[in-house]
């Protein structure tokens, strides 16, 4: 198993835990969706896995195992990539995509002609037209969907074993949501990469995930295969989320 989270509890400052005893796992080539409303603790869990909790946040119980060993910041940074809600917000508006991308690659030891080939190939893989033109563009010259696909391409560049995605489609229109979701699923299948995606959208989770974890008030209220959670939910909260999606299995098809 690539990642195992066992009985995880997280607190901010000296307050009571905001996440209580959450457990889940995800293996290579699989997608786990963590779903819940704002304040449910789903993003906090993702940050703990990625070792990017805010300074006042701390894991107060449980274990995070990566490749069977206690998770360490150095290992996670080397083998994990992040996709945020708006990848464009992470890009410098006065620098071209090519400049940003090449500096990112250089930080991971990829330079020169190898970097040029890598950037072009990755932008092509996420189906961006005219990769050479994209590399010469500034972030504000691209649509939200195109910026997000650039973010996915950059996330793929270091051949991560795990991608952590926090609401990667919530700022996009329906058409661009579908494109970005399919690109993430392609990455998972093509590179045997594990993905954990945080979302409030049950329809999105049901479409792309192999496994779903439902969170409410810092607790895991339901966890299992996507089919089991979608078609045979046990918790009333899960049923409430599903009631808002008439045909979750048909979304984006």
PLM features per residue range, with description:
Residues 35-37:
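The feature captures the beta-strand-to-loop junction immediately N-terminal to the Walker
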Residues 205-207:
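A short, surface-exposed alpha-helical micro-motif characterized by mixed small hydrophobic
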Residues 86, 95-106:
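Q-loop/switch helix immediately C-terminal to the Walker
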Residues 220-224:
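ABC ATPase "signature
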Residues 58, 69-81, 99, 107, ...:
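ABC ATPase NBD coupling module
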Residues 137-142, 146:
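Conserved ABC ATPase signature
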Residues 157-161:
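A short, proline-enriched helix->beta-strand linker immediately N-terminal to the Walker B motif
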């Amino acid at each position: 198993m690539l990642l195992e989270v066992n009985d995880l509890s997280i607190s901010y400052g000296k307050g009571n835990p905001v996440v209580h005893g959450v457990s889940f796992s995800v293996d290579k080539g699989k997608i786990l969706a963590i779903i819940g409303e704002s304040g449910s603790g789903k993003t906090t869990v993702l940050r703990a896995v990625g070792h990017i909790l805010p300074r006042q946040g701390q894991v107060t119980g449980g274990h995070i195992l990566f490749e069977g060993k206690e998770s360490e910041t150095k290992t996670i940074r080397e083998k994990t990539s992040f996709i945020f809600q708006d990848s464009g917000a992470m890009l410098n508006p006065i620098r071209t995509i090519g400049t940003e991308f090449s500096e990112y690659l250089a930080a991971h030891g990829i330079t020169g002609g190898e970097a040029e080939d890598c950037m072009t190939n990755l932008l092509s893989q996420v189906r961006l037209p005219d990769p050479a033109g994209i590399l010469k563009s500034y972030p504000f010259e691209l649509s939200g969907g195109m910026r997000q696909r650039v973010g996915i391409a950059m996330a793929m560049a270091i051949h991560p074993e795990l991608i952590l995605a926090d609401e990667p489609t919530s700022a996009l229109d329906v058409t661009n949501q579908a494109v970005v979701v399919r690109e993430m699923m392609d990455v998972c299948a093509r590179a045997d990469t594990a993905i954990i995606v945080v979302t409030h959208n049950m329809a999105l989770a049901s479409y792309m995930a192999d496994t779903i974890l439902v969170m409410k008030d810092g607790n895991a209220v339901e966890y299992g295969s996507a089919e089991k959670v979608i078609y045979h939910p046990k918790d009333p909260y899960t049923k409430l989320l599903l009631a808002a999606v008439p045909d979750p299995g048909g979304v984006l098809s």
